[in-house]
Amino acid sequence: AERIKNWNIEKIYCSDLKRAMETAAIINETLNVNIVVESQLREIDFGEMTGHSDEENAKYFAFFQKKLKSRRCDLAYPGGECGADVYQRGFPVINKIVHGSTGNVAIVTHGGFIRCMLAGILGMDFAKKSMFGKNMENTSITELDYDTDSEMFTLERFNDYTHLEGKPELLRSSWK
């Protein structure tokens, strides 16, 4: 919150998943603006892989993960979503937020969702979304600028977590 307190954020939008709502509430202790919860900002649905450790998923879904890493096609997670599904679900709310705002907004969401939105917004094949990295740091900042004249987005910042410097316990690499 300290990092963005001077960015003139007019509203916070967040996913309806618990961790996103908790993060939005923490940010709002500093910003004191309205929070709007949008279910369409949820993380990609990992289907049958949800709730399992990376090790379990590597063991039980090895064939799927190998195909996913090939980046040849946009695969749906077993029983879940593919990148295009997430984009079709999420972009309408992003569009509504952009066109319904007069200033800066913060969107608190999830790494998989962000990668899918970026792939779609930047015109990439959804199979290539993993080019944005396997994991994003929690509380990292990805910044898009929307130009109303050209109706185009520009990626200004991606997975920026410099505000976590000096706090290694908060980084993914410290998780056991």
Mark where each language-model region is.
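Acidic, low-complexity terminal tails and accessory targeting/binding regions
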Residues: V33, I44-E56, A119-K176
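Short, active-site-adjacent cap segments at secondary-structure transitions
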Residues: R19-M21, E43-D45, F113-R115
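Short, high-confidence coil segments that cap the C-terminus of an alpha-helix
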Residues: I9, S101-T102
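Short beta-strand scaffold positions
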Residues: C14-S15, Q88, V108-T109
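Active-site catalytic microenvironments for nucleophilic, acid-base chemistry
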Residues: R3, T30, K96, G100, ...
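Active-site-proximal alpha-helix that buttresses catalytic centers in soluble enzyme cores
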Residues: A1-V33, V37
